[in-house]
Amino acid sequence: MRFNPKPIRIEPAFDHPGKIRTMFERCAPYRALATYAPEGIKDEAHEQAMRPVDPWFRGDWALGGEPLVDGADLILHNKRFLEAAKDAFGTSCVNPEFVAVNINGPMPACTTHVDNPSFYGATRVDYPLPFLRVMGGSGLFEAWRVVRASTLSWFYEGAGGSFDYWPEGLDGPMRSEQSPFGNVALCSDNDQMYHRIGTIGNGTEEMPRISASAKIQPDGEGNWIILENGEIRATYPRHAIRFSVLWKAEVRNGNPGVDHLTLDRIMEIFTADLRHRGIDFQVPSDPLTDTPWILLLQRVHANPTDSGGKQ
């Protein structure tokens, strides 16, 4: 299997893209992406943590290989996505895992990053994303890392909003998919390949004052509105909103050959590493939600380029 595959462009991405497009309205509202990484579990030493909350919202349409909303099976079992993943990774074993969607208002370019990892025995089904990110950044769990195909498709014809990526690493040239996107998708390994969203809009739009509790939804009149505490914080025409679909699938040849991780095993590995480094710490009673513990791991295993796997 090739672990750093060359991205494959898929066109057309969907037989009926209009059906996918209408799902965004039907499945609203969507929560702010910031709710996936609450402020108290961000690395406060990073400049990124000091930025206001961007108008970036997310929803889950499929999880654990099962659709969560009507119509998600059209994406989860998309034959073109499956065939591209087989070709890119050189395997016949592709198991769709989840479908997530991103809804973005006008905003600055996001920080270059890689996506949130998964491990055998530790996935987003049972583990919070900040904990999975620090597992990935530590390099201590590579033997258990799930190799995944990532396929992104977009619904946006406005200004900016590019998908920028570095298939040869950050020292190599940047490539971009640009608006108007049309019925296309890109299959790659976004858990390993650095990428970002470019500036959405013309760069002069005023950012709404929102927190992680904000939501976005259509207003029934052709616009999308951001709501928080019962107040409308921003209103956008539909054409100003960038919609994208993220499909993930495990790819492998046969049995991965490793026992699945347990939380006890993960903690054994983390604590042994901290002792080896000579770092004082207290073992938390609930390591998945203990903020000081996760912040300690973030500081020890900080990656100055990666802002937290937002795609």
Region roles according to the model:
Residues 37-54, 119-137, 200-233:
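Charged, glycine/proline-rich intrinsically disordered loops and linkers
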Residues 1-62:
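Generic N-terminal leader segments that precede the first folded domain
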